């Protein structure tokens, strides 16, 4: 490969702490030597978010809307301690939440699999991609303690002034208890369905939606009906052309099936199920350091990719003291590769598509050849048994990836 690949417009968002350092190394060693990008950079480091009253996060989200591709470094979501540490004006909200609220869409998490990294669920040879509907249900519910005997009712008051409808939830006869009212909106469920179908088409894998519609006949039944209607009208022929399928499953059946499967499917989960299952699936694959997170918008055009982990504060503290660190950059690299792969799809850019695939292959091949960071060595040998010779430090590993990428691209006839 003699000339740089023209890559088009990408919005990149810098982050915090150890991941911020790794982010710059990724650009310097793995991306910019080979790809000429129209980079639109936004500094989402905590100090800059504070200085701009978090306007920079909103600006970044609007830029992603405009250019359709965003890649994001991990960022600090401040708690009381962080407010004190950085002398912040206020406890700013999660940038991921802010971006998601502006763009809409669904977050899909996917494990990066290497043959030599052991998995807790040994049968999972392909990723299981979990899409969580991050709106409504328990997370926007009104719950309360019922202090004593009495009735709990739910009332719907139509906006047009027509007759109210009241439903009895429960008559408390002997003492009190607890009660809850929760909701979701058709528009949000429709967007969730479109994002899920788009993800399945882009991966070429089947899609399953899990609910408990046998118990929540109206509530979960609505999810089931909306997905089915959209699938039949807009996606069925595309799925059949790719020889993939969509099915609804009961959540308990789905959990059991997932455990027995080899992976290789998209799993659309309601909010609470997605919260729980995404963590259990991540652990089943062995490491959060090997987990990508992609936000897919319902338009199928707009995508934002990032690592599914945090800013690796502990390593950053060591780095600040001049101590050696061995921080895993793989999920952050895959944020770039997934973003660039999407840019390539939008622009029909075969060279960029080849580069994104080569970058991911180099990461996996390097680890499978025995060159890795300490966390992965610990997955293989167990942390107490890891010796210094078993792993590379942060910078050595990045250099190794750079060297292997250079060699791989040198062989390519682009």
Swiss-Prot record:
Binding site for Mn(2+): 252, 275, 279
UniProt subcellular location: Cytoplasm, Cytosol
Main location: cytoplasm
BP GO terms, sorted: 2-oxoglutarate metabolic process; glutathione metabolic process; glyoxylate cycle; isocitrate metabolic process; NADPH regeneration; regulation of phospholipid biosynthetic process; regulation of phospholipid catabolic process; response to oxidative stress
Cofactor field: Mg(2+); Mn(2+)
Sites where the protein binds NADP(+): 75-77, 82, 260, 310-315, 328
One Gene Ontology term of the molecular function aspect: isocitrate dehydrogenase (NADP+) activity
Keyword flag Acetylation: yes
Modified residues (Phosphoserine): 389
Site (Critical for catalysis) location in chain: 139, 212
Pfam families with a match to the protein in the record: Iso_dh (PF00180)
Post-translational modification summary for this protein: Acetylation at Lys-374 dramatically reduces catalytic activity.
Assembly description: Homodimer.
Full protein name: Isocitrate dehydrogenase [NADP] cytoplasmic
Organism: Microtus ochrogaster
